């Protein structure tokens, strides 16, 4: 949100990492009452008009005696859609909508998609060596620091990362954002673990108290469930399709928990399964400039063919990755 008065920007704000307060509230709270009066506030999405974790933004705008509200697109949330426009107009506030709508539609692509189908927008990510290996047997990073940084930025834009217990037991990943300034934007984590076989010393298990973590399971013992709860893990029983956890069920659950997009970082088996069932909306494939050779593990030679078969558009980016390559499928 940007607030302008007498042709000068007097305040701005963005939605907090937790989703609340909204951008409007964060921009308005920086100003004194007299500064807010007769100003114009620019926002991308129609201000909310319902009570949730915080009061409605329209009430805040009205109380601030804002003269004019400019926003890009109506919110698809039925609690707000079109209602805020009417409320603001009825309070004699000038309202202009559809401002730079084309750009806003791109920004809110994931959000609108999730609202329409009640499931998150699904991204996938893999990093492979030049000779198509997923892992180095010596546990060295496959890609360079530039690629790793881009991957962390990608995580910062995601609500929840989906992974498997096999990936955790093998690699013990952190799945957070480890770039200065983005630490607070680490996504939630969802672990797929049908029989609850996750290692008790894993980082994710022992860090759940600091970052919301779900574990989807099917077969269990009370002892295992109690252990998960003691670690602040949220266990969720999932039905099976064949011998696998029902991924549609998992997506719907994650959407109900407020996740509008997810990123799958789950290795060869999960990625192939979801590709075969066309679950991905977009996919990022990082390709290292290095060959691993005899130290390589988990070869995925047909991955580029499988991705090309699933997606219509491909964008190759090497600009900021030194000798590595990033292929974006969408």
Pin down the residues of each PLM region.
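Internal, well-ordered alpha-helical segments in soluble enzyme and binding-protein domains
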Residues: 57, 80, 84-87, 100-107, ...
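Zn2+-dependent cytidine deaminase-like catalytic core
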Residues: 3-103, 188, 275
